[in-house]
A protein has these predicted regions:
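Catalytic binding pocket for nucleotide-activated donors in carbohydrate/polymer assembly enzymes
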Residues: 69-78, 83-193
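Nucleotide-sugar donor-binding catalytic core of glycosyltransferases
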Residues: 1-107, 124-131
Length: 193
């Protein structure tokens, strides 16, 4: 994946007319990913894939040397998805899923999802952020696979909550994550030294 210009993430996109969910991610071999990240991501994909109301597209990007490749083979992404299609399909996706990966970092996805103004279901955020993300305000936090399933069902049915999460995620991005806001925050911290 070669990341695209920020404008592509920030630009609005027409939503799908159906309950379409798109999600691709890397299958990681790092220890915390084997125990948590890969498990949550696979549960999300399988639940969405098997859900009668959802048209799911996606899967894992699995490197041949990944020791867990066989375990998740049924979720292997078939073919290549260009970054432009990844962005467009993520924007069309009714909801998105975030979980920290290697060393519990946020990775690209959290920032991408905020920039796109998506309704985000996420496992707990353990790292410091410029301002906390708040459950049911700008993110939907889950702690178990049962909570994950309930969150998916809730957000495909509760349009008002989903739209509120989308709008507040975009507002959070504009206030705290947009490049000019990050630079401003760094400059303010340097002045305080």
């Amino acid at each position: 994946f070669r990341r695209q210009k920020l404008e592509q993430y920030e630009a609005s996109c027409k939503r799908s007319n159906q309950d379409y969910i798109f999600f691709i991610s890397t299958l990681w071999s790092h220890e915390n990913c084997v125990a948590s990240t890969n498990v949550f991501r696979s549960e999300y994909m399988l639940y969405c894939h098997n859900h009668p109301k959802i048209l799911f597209e996606g899967g894992f990007l699995i490197k041949d040397k990944n020791r867990q490749g066989e375990v998740y083979e049924r979720l292997r992404l078939k073919g290549h998805i260009p970054i432009s299609a990844y962005i467009d399909n993520t924007k069309k996706s009714l909801i998105v899923f975030n979980t920290p990966s290697c060393w519990d970092c946020h990775g690209w996805k959290l920032g991408e999802f905020l920039a796109m103004g998506k309704a985000i279901i996420s496992t707990p955020i353990t790292n410091e952020l410029p301002y906390p993300l708040i459950h049911r305000q700008n993110i939907y936090i889950i702690n178990s696979k049962e909570e994950l399933y309930k969150a998916v069902d809730l957000l495909i049915e509760d349009h008002a909550l989903r739209i509120s999460l989308e709008e507040n995620a975009k507002a959070y991005y504009r206030e705290y994550v947009a490049p000019e806001k990050v630079i401003e925050s760094i400059a303010n911290k340097l002045r305080d030294i």
